[in-house]
Amino acid sequence: MLLIPAIDLKDGHCVRLIQGDMDQSTTFGEDPAIIARRWLDAGARRLHLVDLNGAFAGQPKNLVAIKAILKEVDGRIPVQLGGGIRDLDTIEKYIDAGISYVIIGTAAVKNPGFLQDACSAFGGHVIVGLDAKDGKVAIDGWSKLTGQDVHSVAKRFEDWGVESIIYTDIGRDGMLTGINIDATVNLAQSLKIPVIASGGLAGMADIEALCKVEDEGIEGVICGRAIYSGDLDFAAAQARADELRA
């Protein structure tokens, strides 16, 4: 089970949002590279970066911070990045810079042709982030519910060659109320590609519960507010996940 620390970038700093609201942000670190080093030293095997300004602007906005993180990581573990990725040129620049996986969210739903082109050009490097509430896909920084069923959308993306799906229950994200494990497992069972859980991770109990259903197709979990607030010790959680897998 991959435990993936999240580094959300806003104005060059590491922050956490509550339910995707840019006005409800808590700054957890001035220097994102130092934050990246912390998780690397704690045993992280992948990092999850989000360009929050980019997500709202529709184009990259935190390039300096992203490059500083990549320099710190220096290729030792994969780094996945989402937020503001709307064209093939941006994907190419990020991959050339050292990003292992690009995460396409809103653009995948609003512009399916772009996602197909991305999978064709950068196969193996494309992850789709599907945000949902009550089983319906949300877009545009969670501000709009589309009415589209998350299972049917994910299945279509799987057929196009997406590497994996990050599934976020937006009713729980940043709330420390616990991962929606039933919904995550239901999605994973309907797909052949792996699912990464996200949204609401509260503590060790969630890690243990996810490990029990790992074989259903759940590759990992995004660790956000809980590892910054102290509700979850990242190194201890990764050790526990490894122990349960042994």
From Swiss-Prot:
GO biological process, one term: L-tryptophan biosynthetic process
Domain of life (superkingdom): Bacteria
Keyword set, alphabetical order: Amino-acid biosynthesis, Cytoplasm, Histidine biosynthesis, Isomerase
GO cellular component terms listed in the entry, alphabetical order: cytoplasm
GO MF terms held by the record: 1-(5-phosphoribosyl)-5-[(5-phosphoribosylamino)methylideneamino]imidazole-4-carboxamide isomerase activity
Keyword Amino-acid biosynthesis attributed: yes
Gene3D superfamilies: Aldolase class I
Stated name of the protein: 1-(5-phosphoribosyl)-5-[(5-phosphoribosylamino)methylideneamino] imidazole-4-carboxamide isomerase
Active site: 8 (proton acceptor), 131 (proton donor)
InterPro entries: Aldolase_TIM (IPR013785), His_biosynth (IPR006062), HisA_bact_arch (IPR006063), Isoase_HisA-like (IPR044524), Isoase_HisA-like_bact (IPR023016), RibuloseP-bd_barrel (IPR011060)
Subcellular location: Cytoplasm
Pathway(s): Amino-acid biosynthesis; L-histidine biosynthesis; L-histidine from 5-phospho-alpha-D-ribose 1-diphosphate: step 4/9
